[in-house]
Amino acid sequence: PSATSGRININVSPQNTSIIHAIYKTTNGNNISGVYKSTNKGLNWTTLGMNGLESSGFDWYIGVIETAPNNPGVLYVGSIDMFRTTNNGSSWTNLTNAYSGTFDQQHPDQHAFWINPLNSQYIINGNDGGIFISTNAGTNWSKRYDLPITQYYAGCIDFLNPAKKYGGTQDNGSHGSVNPGPAGWEVLYGGDGFHCAVDYTNSNVIYMESQNGGIGRSDDGGNNFDGITGGLDLARTNWSSPYMLDVQTSTTVYFGSYKLHKSTNKGNNWTIISPDLTKGQNGRLGTITCMSNAVLPSTQRVIYTGADDGRVMVTTNSGTNWTDISAGLPVRYVTDVVVDKRNPNVAYVTLSGFNMDERNTHAFRTTNYGTNWVNITGNLLNVPANSLIIDYNKDSTLFVGTDAGVYYT
């Protein structure tokens, strides 16, 4: 292609290494923009047809191309679904139809294929839902191995019954578990799962969330959920939009898009209590990523927020006034902000980022509401720090979750 390209996937035919296929997407779009074939090791390319090859809007994230090992004329492409052509792209057949069946039969977002070189009817498909196998070239699929693994974005527990655990996962919904072990988990809320929270005075009240702020509430212990997004300004939302319960009044909920919202009736109604707490929209940046709250003796709320563009804000009067306290912090994605509930002028921030000019700058502490920040990264590896918690049973103990593991000090 002559246009600026984004993600490119390439396959070299195992039967004839002169034959190469490629799919690409442009930088200004999220769909497959073209399928190409070369028969002379890439010296020249021809465009293949895309009739029936449905794109997903997520091909910057997924997208794979393979040729049948014993027939380079048979081509497979993975997007949300898996497609096959036997006529150089004149027509494509959807082999998975992930949204038309159950996720035990197939799952969206295809990442990897393996086609048996001795029997091309036998295909192994890896996607966001696990491993699926077809023994008839994609006509039917079955989920295999049922590995008890998935990618969790966030988790929470029921403080009245800590055996009850909940979490939100990548493309596999939000889960809940009462019993230990993989058999004890069940899907409670669909979509991509993110933050969750349980009312600390009533175990039946559970909050869960799908992508881009799709928050819902259950009043019956997770059996049924109702959406509570009415009244939220969702013009700019993070993929994993943060929300939290008030530290003292469990029916009060805060939700962050690019503004902070407050509900005093468990999300039935919302009020905006802040201006834009980011630096403004800039591409995909300009959303709140994290928040934390505490109570002053005056009963005023102290709330800290962090954003994907590096801005950190604080209010010490329940949202009436806000102060930008980003000065002294690197300009990076703010992954977590945590206020010390015993002393709200103390707060911690963790930051993302790789190989920056300022090395070892992933964790900071303030003791004066963000007027000054102290770098407490110490001997943490120079990788993103994603979360931080305070051990309130031990005055000086902190835990930090990073891309390289969990650390404590």
Protein language model annotation of sequence segments:
Residues 1-409:
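Beta-propeller blade termini and top-face loops
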